[in-house]
């Protein structure tokens, strides 16, 4: 995939506080990336730097030639006393767009606001309608790269479904590359190709949707009365495993009865054995814990 935008050791510091610390990442053309982190992780600060709203303390941002950018950062910047169509007309004037009326009607249709009462002021819109109007403002100039800061946050299930549909359509039908942030991993499950996990200003993990699905596959968990001897026995018999806190994690395809017989033959007592699939939330918390451990080394 060709790179659309990349950063190298991008940092933002206020006094001694490192809001964003040495972030190096690449956004590829045509993908939807999910930037995930708890409140205060530095997501919005990073997005504000990428969109050019604030400057970095150090590091570089490189984008492909003639890359146009649109952004919805934090609260939608709407004109509360204007209707949806007049909000877009106001933005079109700022952008000096030609054939603006035709483009405005097309954009309203993209976000599902084409049938809204033209006299209804945006201050009277529902949250979902305001978010969709904000996206309309961000895409009015046909950006190549679209930044969306928590556009799903606070929406009801219907609003979430509508927003996901809009985001996928912008990529699939209009070729936009999208970076979307959230503090909830599962919110992005249906739309993103790749996840970027952020914690305390750092990127702690990046993985594709396929890699996440593999990580969350059902696993066999084992606990015995002799942890070191169990690991040695598994290694001697070529059985792959991972350490997961107090448990030993094995493939769900492992033959349980054969495993138990093997351990009994080596005088190892099985205290607990069960199959379980890791949740999005559990995996996310594991990554945050890894981030905490990394942070102590800085």
How would you label these PLM feature ranges?
Residues 219-290:
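Short, charged/small-residue-rich alpha-helical element at the C-terminal edge
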Residues 146-150:
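Catalytic Walker B motif of ABC-type/P-loop ATPase nucleotide-binding domains
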Residues 36-38:
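The feature captures the beta-strand-to-loop junction immediately N-terminal to the Walker
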């Amino acid at each position: 995939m060709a790179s659309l935008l990349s950063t190298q050791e991008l940092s933002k510091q206020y006094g001694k506080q490192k809001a964003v610390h040495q972030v190096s990442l690449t956004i590829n053309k045509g993908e939807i990336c999910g930037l995930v982190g708890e409140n205060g992780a530095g997501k919005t600060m990073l997005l504000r730097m990428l969109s050019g709203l604030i400057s970095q303390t150090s590091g570089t941002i490189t984008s492909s030639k003639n890359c146009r950018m649109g952004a919805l950062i934090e609260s939608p910047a709407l004109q509360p006393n204007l209707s949806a169509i007049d909000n877009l007309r106001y933005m079109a004037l700022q952008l000096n767009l030609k054939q603006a009326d035709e483009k405005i009607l097309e954009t309203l249709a993209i976000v599902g606001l084409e049938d809204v009462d033209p006299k209804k002021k945006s201050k009277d819109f529902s949250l979902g309608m305001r978010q969709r109007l904000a996206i309309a403002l961000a895409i009015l100039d046909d950006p190549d790269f679209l930044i969306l800061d928590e556009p799903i946050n606070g929406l009801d299930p219907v609003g979430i479904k509508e927003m996901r549909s809009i985001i996928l359509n912008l990529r699939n039908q209009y070729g936009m590359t999208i970076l979307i942030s959230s503090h909830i991993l599962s919110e992005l499950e249906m739309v993103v190709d790749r996840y970027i996990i952020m914690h305390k200003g750092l990127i702690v993990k990046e993985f594709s949707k396929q890699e996440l699905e593999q990580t969350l596959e059902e696993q066999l968990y084992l606990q015995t009365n002799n942890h070191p001897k169990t690991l040695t026995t598994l290694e001697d018999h070529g059985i792959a495993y991972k350490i997961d806190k107090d448990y030993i994690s094995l493939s769900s395809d492992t033959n349980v009865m054969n495993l138990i017989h093997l351990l009994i033959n080596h005088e190892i007592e099985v205290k607990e054995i069960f199959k379980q699939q890791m949740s999005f939330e559990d995996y996310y918390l594991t990554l945050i814990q890894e981030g905490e451990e990394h942070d102590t080394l800085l």
